Amino acid sequence: DEELSEELAEKLMLTSTIAGMAIAQTGTSIPHALSYDVTYHNGVAHGKACGIFLAAYLRVYAEQKPEDVEEILTLLGFKTLDDFASYLTEILGTVSLTQKEVTFYIDRMMENTSKLATCPFELTREDIEKIYRESIVVE
């Protein structure tokens, strides 16, 4: 609730610009794609919407490429996915959706073949459902 200082605002704009340039060069992955509907239709801040899907996405990823997830967790300073998931819940809180919304958003994601193609392995509807189940509180 504090007022944003000019210095902090400048740093925020700089980091946002650098992040935008990185995304423009590398693209984004599944948590980012899953965040679109949650942000647009439910008003959840974009960063939070991306973050709530990270741990569950990494769980699905670990089923295919456990060594990659192990390296990610090590680089982030976490020993386990559970530790990482707990940390994300602590800083982001939870997001609640209705089952109707979840089903609609999953349907839309499955139609988004360009975003599904960013995943380094084939992502099934069941995988997306699992990610939602572990990331969202269904009302």
Where are these regions (language model features)?
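Active-site segments that bind and position negatively charged phosphate/pyrophosphate groups
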Residues: D1-S86
